[in-house]
């Protein structure tokens, strides 16, 4: 009885995952290859992947293609070119959090640089990445050597940007004055640390 329920559960899960392939047009697109992903890295090529920003039904196709692209090019670099592609491949992943999860991306982004491949991950906020990749999000961010922040209001991102900038040392002067029969003045000087930019300043 238990085995039967398990098998039924597996079939239901499989059916749900494969449901988009009930669409004839999608089956046709996936039935043959005309993109020549294996040629990218051999010659200068521009490949645009455009998806709906309101309907996520086919996002898995984009994620699957990008996963295959990274793995294919890494293998090609090692097998045919001694480790590095002859033409640099740059992936500009706008709305990265909306294309679906790329399997093993935390490991891919750590290795593609040496193969002459780079990826620019564009997000609305860092919380998007953490929602998609959970514990692997920090690994992905750690393998990005440049961060460009164009502003935003999401508190977690603002805090992380402020911490990333670090602190500066400032000179702090405190003065005191005592008013009585004999006036006295005091001056206290010390160095202290201050966030280079606070969350409010970044926003």
Question: Where would I find each of the regions flagged by the language model?
Answer:
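Structural recognition of the conserved hydrophobic beta-strand(s) that form the central parallel beta-sheet
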Residues: 118-124
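Acidic, glycine-rich active-site loops and adjacent beta-strand->loop/helix elements
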Residues: 97, 125-127
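P-loop NTPase motor core of the ASCE superfamily
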Residues: 44-47, 107-110, 128-203
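Conserved residues at beta->alpha junctions
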Residues: 52, 123, 152
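Preference for short coil/turn "hinge" residues that link or interrupt alpha-helices
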Residues: 30-33, 92, 122, 190, ...
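P-loop NTPase motor domains
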Residues: 1-117, 132, 201
């Amino acid at each position: 009885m238990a085995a039967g329920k398990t098998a039924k559960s597996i079939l239901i899960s499989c059916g749900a995952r494969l449901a988009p392939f009930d669409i004839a047009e999608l089956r046709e697109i996936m039935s043959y290859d005309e993109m020549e992903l294996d040629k990218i890295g051999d010659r200068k090529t521009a490949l645009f992947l455009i998806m709906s920003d309101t309907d996520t039904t086919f996002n898995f196709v984009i994620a699957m293609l990008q996963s295959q692209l990274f793995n294919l090019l890494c293998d090609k670099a090692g097998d045919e070119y001694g480790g590095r592609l002859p033409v640099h491949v740059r992936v500009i992943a706008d709305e990265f959090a909306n294309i679906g999860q790329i399997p093993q991306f935390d490991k891919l982004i750590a290795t593609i640089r040496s193969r002459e491949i780079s990826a620019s991950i564009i997000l609305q906020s860092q919380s998007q990445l953490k929602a998609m990749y959970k514990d692997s999000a920090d690994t992905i961010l750690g393998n990005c050597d440049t961060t460009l922040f164009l502003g935003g209001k999401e508190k977690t991102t603002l805090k992380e940007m402020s911490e990333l900038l670090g602190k500066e040392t400032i000179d702090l002067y405190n003065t005191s004055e005592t008013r009585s029969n004999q006036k006295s003045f005091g001056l206290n000087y010390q160095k202290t640390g201050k966030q280079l930019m606070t969350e409010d300043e970044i926003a």
